[in-house]
């Protein structure tokens, strides 16, 4: 059974942040959830928390909430998609349909990262890894055909448009992870004067400082807030990092709080000269090529349907995997047995003959697999598999 449970940007950030899974805790959470299902992948971003499962049977949602220590009063806000609906949902997500910024491409890197983090836990996720790989393949073709790469949209470009319209030229970035890097990439070619960097130093951020030290520099948070006209907050901290006491009295300041959980304490929102825009409000100012993106995405939706069908075919064909493995094992045993009858050859030559026989046997098996695949698509897979058993295994 393939299914996903999740909560996304359609639920307000104040509630959504209660279920955000911090990156440093993801491996620990994956280990806990592996008690409930054979395969698990967590996709956790500022816009969504989704858990994908592949298991023999569906897991009770209450067990998941218990394992993650989540408040069960909010269970009704979560969606659950099963089998084909689950596949379709992931493909829509990675193609940008289910984003605050329609068509944005940051989700592609986030889906890749989710797949890689699941590998660190150990154990195999053959079905979910294949699902995510096909989703990424689908996204690549979809974005190319829909020409989304010609008109890219990111949270940085949306925020950058606001800053330009407001003539803001001194910006502070608090949090130097993936979002921080995204903004640095955007600002390196913009006409802002200063970009103050607050957070843990890393090699990628160092490159911006080295290439343009006049624009980019690491700075102390307190001094930064005195000088900056705008704060862009995107840390992965489980608590707020900007408080009322950090803001000088009467200071005019624009803050983009892009983190989930929030980086900015609620008291800051109430300061008279401070305007805070959170992650859920960003989509309201997304006007860059929006109609073009929506139109092109709708025109190319058939690409998603194609990949959904492709994955379902692969998933259904997996029922024959034991038969295929048994055929190959049986063929290898027969080849090794026949080699024993060869006389007057040394061990190296015997091994070479054995490899050649196994290779030839696999050519016939591969053809049998193709015939089985064709029969399965035509609805006669069971008849064909029984015939293959009689030919190859009896």
UniProtKB/Swiss-Prot annotation:
NCBIfam families tied to this protein: hemA (TIGR01035)
Pathway the protein contributes to: Porphyrin-containing compound metabolism; protoporphyrin-IX biosynthesis; 5-aminolevulinate from L-glutamyl-tRNA(Glu): step 1/2
Residues carrying the site annotation Important for activity: 89
Family of the protein in this entry: Belongs to the glutamyl-tRNA reductase family.
Catalytic activity entry: (S)-4-amino-5-oxopentanoate + tRNA(Glu) + NADP(+) = L-glutamyl-tRNA(Glu) + NADPH + H(+)
Binding site for NADP(+): 175-180
Pfam families to which the protein is assigned, alphabetical: GlutR_dimer (PF00745), GlutR_N (PF05201), Shikimate_DH (PF01488)
Gene name for this UniProt entry: hemA
One record GO biological process: protoporphyrinogen IX biosynthetic process from glutamate
Organism the protein comes from: Caldicellulosiruptor bescii (strain ATCC BAA-1888 / DSM 6725 / KCTC 15123 / Z-1320) (Anaerocellum thermophilum)
UniProt: substrate binding residues: 45-48, 99, 104-106, 110
PROSITE patterns registered for this protein in UniProt: GLUTR (PS00747)
Name of the molecule in the record: Glutamyl-tRNA reductase
Keyword Oxidoreductase recorded: yes
Active-site residues from the entry: 46 (nucleophile)
Domain remarks: Possesses an unusual extended V-shaped dimeric structure with each monomer consisting of three distinct domains arranged along a curved 'spinal' alpha-helix. The N-terminal catalytic domain specifically recognizes the glutamate moiety of the substrate. The second domain is the NADPH-binding domain, and the third C-terminal domain is responsible for dimerization.
Enzyme class, spelled out: oxidoreductase
